[in-house]
Amino acid sequence: MSESNPTNAATAPRAVRTGPGTPPRADAVSARGLALHGARGLVYGPVDLALPAGTLTVIQGPQGAGRSSLLLTLAGRMVPDAASELRVLGHRLPAERRAVQRAAAIAGFAGIDDLDDGVTVGDTVRERLSWLAPWYRRVPRVDQRTFRDLALPVFGERPLPRVESVVWDLDEVDAMLLRLTLALAQRPRLLVVDDVDQVRDTVRRSTVWSRLEAVAATGTTVAASVSSLDEVARTRWARQPHQVTLATGPHAVPAPDAA
């Protein structure tokens, strides 16, 4: 079982007003009965979702609840059960998943966007920019100014790593923020971030959450996962995020606000 807070979503996009005098906007993600089964049974779901565009959603759930798989489904990288109804950024999934893949970026996923500890920050960024550029365009070496322009929206007032720094020397917060920077180089409309609590210290993790809030404030829809079921309650937010609690898998627990 899974529970979404706020309300469950209908299949059709829901109009959301952002403030007085502003036109309504559709949800970036809407789902009904979204679920995924694998060879060993239920991976996640069923869950209903309504994630407004330009907001932060925290997906909470214990190990085995399917947090990573749910995020990859929203980003068009995994295909849900056939009975699921899912629309992301105006596209029906899985039929239009290529369009979603172009507009959705991922970060924090073990085995997918891991950093190479033995290379420099500059070379890491250059490799990412080369991947995003047309095949015929040569990407020059990344200097500190180029990196600053790319990373400033993510790092904010936090001091930037030097481009000559080796990834191995970055602390866990800077490493996570670098992964976010690489993902946002795609200029996505949707960013999904897995396992935010790989930054183990609660106080230091709050820095990552504040930067994800800043990203969402620019208009990018952000969905990020964490295993701690009280993460939202004990984190100080500039604006209360949306919350989805997954309670599937071998360690199933009821959602905090379940009756």
Describe the function of each predicted region:
Residues 103, 110, 117-137, 146:
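Q-loop/switch helix immediately C-terminal to the Walker
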Residues 75-76:
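Helix-to-loop junction immediately C-terminal to a conserved catalytic motif
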Residues 67:
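Conserved lysine of the Walker
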Residues 83-92, 100:
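Conserved ABC transporter NBD signature motif
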Residues 31-34, 42-52, 84:
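Conserved beta-strand
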Residues 180:
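Hydrophobic anchor residue at the start of the ABC signature
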Residues 17, 23-39:
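Conserved N-terminal strand/loop that marks the beginning of ABC ATPase nucleotide-binding domains
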Residues 60-62:
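The feature captures the beta-strand-to-loop junction immediately N-terminal to the Walker
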